[in-house]
């Protein structure tokens, strides 16, 4: 059995979801017999690093990030950032979402330290987090995406009216979102010019680049991809896609993570041909971005043709997340999924 450090928390807007992911990962690894060291990245950039490998996590308050951090620090002391440089882990299991946890920053840090980790490498993580760059790669690979524009803050400040007029050519409704972000945080469905101006100003308060994309009507599905090492070869498999029926206007943060926020159906209620096509495209997206270990790609099926919405390199791994749902539908246990992720991470570190 391995000594595994689990990174979770972080300073992104997805901190609370990462805590739930981290708790689920720690529980699962513990049942598998691994030595687990939960390492909490605090909202203000600190690290709470236990001195020993022992499973003591305040699961009972995992739904309250502030209380969770308080209880976690009671057990393990204050932030010990310096201890991360002498981390004695066989591998780091990444349970982070968004921001520096998913954009290649943490991955690069671990590369410098020479510590193997789960999931995609620096380049794939950075590209997938940048929605504009990812869409450009998808288009170059012959895949379909909704029409889009990227606007940077300086362009907006210098030519606000021109920017608004440009974005209006996408038509209404359209989706406005930060170029770098996840879990549909700060994603807005825009229906008119005034709302466009209002939400652009709001997003630019905390982000430097915005992408607006035409609204497509269709069936929303999401498909996970797992990598495995079998018979001396690396293999990629696509899981059964999940159909997303949002409780609101679209599959936003509330729909994803609040109880009753959306209705998720696995396998999706689509034709066999559509399912096969979605799975093929999910693997193609994974390959195009250079992902490793696992990924999850969201689609919208318009008149039988899937269009890519985005690819997540560190998809949610809470008890209600899509990857666990899809793995179960495929007859794959989460213990097997985690074993494969660990094996892929360790083997990749050798090259």
Swiss-Prot record:
Mg(2+) 1 binds at residues 298, 310. ATP binds at residues 167-222. The keyword Transmembrane helix does not apply. Pfam families: Dala_Dala_lig_C, Dala_Dala_lig_N. It catalyses: 2 D-alanine + ATP = D-alanyl-D-alanine + ADP + phosphate + H(+). Keywords: ATP-binding, Cell shape, Cell wall biogenesis/degradation, Cytoplasm, Ligase, Magnesium, Manganese, Metal-binding, Nucleotide-binding, Peptidoglycan synthesis. It is an enzyme of class 6 (ligase). Its main location: cytoplasm. Binds 2 magnesium or manganese ions per subunit. GO terms for cellular component: cytoplasm. Residues 135-343 form the ATP-grasp domain. PANTHER family: D-ALANINE--D-ALANINE LIGASE, D-ALANINE--D-ALANINE LIGASE B. Belongs to the D-alanine--D-alanine ligase family. This is D-alanine--D-alanine ligase. It comes from Leptospira interrogans serogroup Icterohaemorrhagiae serovar Lai (strain 56601).
